[in-house]
């Protein structure tokens, strides 16, 4: 399907209105998954011409994303990735977990950006950065599109490796679904129950009464850890 290639229009506007010299594009992946982290990439591209075929990662085939990923990592001025774990998502909620992952990505950059272009309509990042939210920014903004591809390839590989390396995860087909809803994923949940890599605050668990107790166990353990001054987190 034909698509309009992303441009530097938003970045140029942000530079002109804020005086920013370094602008980072930020995008996330994994928001709607049942398992695995939410991952954020921050990418600084400058105003150079992008590699051919760059667009929102969701519009690209897995093969094309894999081809573009090393090209983009070499082409961008800088990039960094940040993750928030399933436990952090359960503890904090998705909005705060997104901010945590984004801060980790931005603080991982070798240069501090003066401003940020954030994909979507909600500013989950906030101060101290100057933020411009752009709906479908991963399709229209070059830096955000680059971040979307790098984040997607990184997280997909992470989930595939998790599925291959962990016996507990073998039946969930993470290599194919990356932790997102799928018939195979649902069937494995019904049979085996969620793993330590699943988000227990997600609504899917409401349809699995056999495993409801795991939600209570995790959150009871975390509440006890907080009361004792310990660290949040629980492993099954």
Curated annotation (Swiss-Prot):
Similarity section: Belongs to the RNase HII family.
Enzyme class name: hydrolase
Gene Ontology molecular function terms on file: manganese ion binding; RNA binding; RNA-DNA hybrid ribonuclease activity
GO BP annotations, alphabetical order: DNA replication, removal of RNA primer; mismatch repair
Positions bound to a divalent metal cation: 27-28, 119
A Pfam family assignment: RNase_HII
Catalyzed reactions: Endonucleolytic cleavage to 5'-phosphomonoester
Cofactor: Mn(2+); Mg(2+)
Domain of life, source organism: Bacteria
The record's free-text note on cofactor binding: Manganese or magnesium. Binds 1 divalent metal ion per monomer in the absence of substrate. May bind a second metal ion after substrate binding.
EC code(s) of this entry: 3.1.26.4
Annotated keywords: Cytoplasm, Endonuclease, Hydrolase, Manganese, Metal-binding, Nuclease
Cleaved signal peptide residues: none
PANTHER family: RIBONUCLEASE H2 SUBUNIT A (PTHR10954), RIBONUCLEASE HII (PTHR10954:SF18)
Name recorded for this polypeptide: Ribonuclease HII
Disulfide linkage: none
Residues annotated as domain RNase H type-2: 21-214
Main localisation: cytoplasm
Keyword hit for Signal: no
């Amino acid at each position: 399907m034909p698509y309009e290639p992303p441009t530097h229009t938003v970045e140029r506007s942000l530079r002109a209105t804020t005086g920013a010299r370094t602008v980072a594009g930020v995008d996330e992946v994994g928001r709607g998954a049942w398992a695995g982290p939410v991952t954020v990439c921050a990418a600084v591209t400058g105003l150079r011409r992008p590699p051919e075929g760059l667009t929102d990662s969701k519009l690209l085939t897995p093969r094309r994303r894999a081809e573009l990923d090393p090209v983009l990592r070499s082409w961008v001025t800088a990039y960094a990735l940040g993750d928030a774990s399933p436990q952090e998502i359960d503890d904090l909620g998705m909005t705060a977990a997104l901010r945590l992952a984004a801060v980790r990505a931005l603080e991982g950059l070798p240069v501090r950006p003066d401003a940020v272009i954030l994909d979507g309509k909600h500013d989950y990042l906030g101060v101290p950065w100057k933020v411009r939210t752009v709906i479908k920014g991963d399709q229209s903004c070059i830096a955000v599109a680059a971040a979307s591809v790098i984040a997607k390839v990184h997280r997909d590989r992470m989930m595939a490796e998790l599925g291959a390396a962990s016996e507990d995860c073998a039946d969930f087909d993470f290599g194919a679904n990356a932790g997102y809803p799928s018939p195979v994923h649902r069937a494995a949940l019904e049979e085996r129950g969620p793993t330590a890599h699943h988000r227990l605050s997600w609504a899917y668990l409401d349809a699995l009464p056999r495993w409801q107790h795991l939600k209570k166990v995790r959150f009871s353990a975390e509440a006890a850890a907080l009361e004792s001054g310990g660290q949040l987190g629980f492993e099954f």
